[in-house]
Amino acid sequence: MKELYPGDQGIWVQYLQLALQRAGQQVMLDGIFGPKTCAAVEKVMGSSGKCAVKEAQWNRLLPFLRGYITHEVKAGDTFFSIAKMHNTTIERIMHANPGMDAGALQIGSTVVVPLNFPLVSEEVLYTSLLTGWIIEGLMARYPYLQVGTIGRSVMGTPLWSLRLGNGPVEVGYNASFHANESITTPVLLKFVERLLEAYADEHMYEELYPERLFEEYSLYLVPLVNPDGVDLVNGLLTEGFYYRRAVRIASGFPDIPFPDGWKANIQGVDLNLQFPAGWDMAKKIKFEQGYNRPAPRDYVGQTPLSVPESIAMFDFTRNHDFSLILAYHTQGEVIYWKYLDEEPEGARRIAEYLSLIHISEPTRH
């Protein structure tokens, strides 16, 4: 964890401010460690005149980013008293501890205590770090959520996969193929959180019952396909070998703003152009446009499937029998439903339906 001091700016400060907000402090999520943020740190920590954030302070604040704590049961404890102690609800505690007898808590046992706020924020920039905290928190809140990895990125970051349901029909979702499109990651994570919450509370979600959905379908989600690139764009990666190499790559394309215009993985390969289908055609087009070497965007790579993220997504897709895949992007405001002359059965109907509930327009690819 990065040590923070007054005057610091950036993504780490924004995460600090998010934790402070959830701890009850009135601070803006502006990423600037100013006087109000300093005062909030002092108040939460109970230490006047000391607003540096080091390991001990982060350890106090991390539960507000992961969304839960653990409580060791003592004599006389009940779910009600534990909920009151930590300002949360009995229902949240029960959902997180499905195998525990609420009427006979064992002294010394550990209770997972979800804190009483939505876990997936829509107000901060996303990185691999925040995504990992959220996934950990979702697992704690909803222990029946199935979590795994499909591989690792160039820098060794896990490529997380989430599974909801155990039905025979498989549906795939993914987000943040492109580094500067990370707003798609909280879209998927918020979908997961709301669906799990509705399932736990036995409520309907968007006119359907999650229990029935999970019996008929298995939903597989990869919320952060390009973690290294996202970390670069959103300010988590600011030094070291990979950062310096990205700077060198970007210097060859001065018309593309750095890092905001970076779409590729950390090696300068556009993951969305890495798949065997149409690769030769894409190579011809992109090379003619000047993207014939590692670049912030549109470089197809030396060969198809030449970087770990695209290989992981390719293998993951081949290992499943997806009836539908939804790949979330930004910038275009269109829904691609057809690839060249290949049109999956029902694809246009699905795209037209989605266009009715979103601002995007259906279009061929």
Question: What feature does the model see in each segment?
Answer:
Residues P35-G46:
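Short, solvent-exposed alpha-helical surface patches in non-cytosolic proteins
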Residues S355-H365:
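Residue-level detector of conserved catalytic or cofactor/ligand-binding positions
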